[in-house]
Amino acid sequence: EGFLLNGKSVKIKGVNIHHDLGCMGVAAYDDALLRRLLKLRSIGCNAIRTAHNPHSESLLEMCDSLGLLVMNEFIDEWKVAKKKWITERAKEDAPDSISIGYTRYFDTHAEHDLKSFIRRDRNHPCVILWSIGNEIEWTYPYYWASSKDNKGFKGLIHTGDPETDNKSILKEFNRLSGGKDDLAETAAVLAGWVKDVDTTRPVSSGVVVPSVSRLSGYTDVLDVVGYNYKDKYYEIDHKLYPYQPIIGSENVGQLFEWTAVADKKYIAGIFVWTGFDYLGENGPWPARGGDCSFFDFVGNKTARGHFFECLWKDTPKTHIVTIPEKESEFKMDTDGSFTYTPRPGWIRRWEWYDTRDKWKYRRDEDILVQVYTNAPEVELFLNGKSLGTKKRSDFMEHNILMWKVA
């Protein structure tokens, strides 16, 4: 039945957030945290996932009072360091001092740290899930190499169609792992430590290779299975494992991620990556961080934020953006319809459409006007002259109404 709050079904409209505050650094300034939470709530967000480490207790206190739900996450890596942003993205061999994080302390500190984390936060009513990890499969190559749609990094893992040949997957998994799976064993230990301290909330984790993790025993120790970028697996896995709740623990901020869960009662909801821009995972200079969010570093609402506000709130809303047609991925056909040709590259799934919040162009430019709305139809005016009324039902593929202004 998805997620029930006081016996009532509630769809989780969540976001992932990092603990940094942009140029203010990683100190937890209460005023800045509250400002961010209020902005998230203003667009219909009702939940956050603390990616990928414990956040400040003051953040949880604010979520308690604001009515925001929390998927409270412990750690991003276990016994094996990820290193993916050093060795995979940058293609650099980095010293252990900067490429290995909590891994070096896991064996000696994990039990104490996890239990202390649970004890600190267990009395916060906002906490609905304990997450013991995130995309841990990345650190065990025999996981992502055991399934045909998971043959490596750079997004291939996120785009494959559901693979259902469980017999072949398991055979390959056993061959590559040598019959011993440290990941599943560690997950069982961590889940047990959580239950030692708190049995009132379910244990979850952000799983990124469910086609393998469902067979290895990894997900057997989870009460709720978090799916990272695997919307194509929701329906088939619900049929195969109807007894185990699932949730979108990490999702790109695109329409298809929301439509995949909006009308499915058995999925609790999603956590979009991300609520705010964050330090790290940046592109070429001068970028300082990730920009795939609903709000930028200083709190300005992005086009994506306006779009999701139309999805998540019933309050009437219309937001207009523009782009020269020659710079857009959308092109108007001779019949007045629009064709979408996305830019190549695996990172495109996280990027929003190119848009501008302005109307300042040359007279000889062909401009695409795009409208985000939750209204059934919109009429566009330019200098008092109507350019026509368009229905949202005619633009359901992208949920963006469009006009070409020549």
Where on the chain are the PLM-derived regions?
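Substrate-binding clefts and catalytic carboxylate motifs of secreted carbohydrate-active enzymes
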Residues: 125-131, 137-406
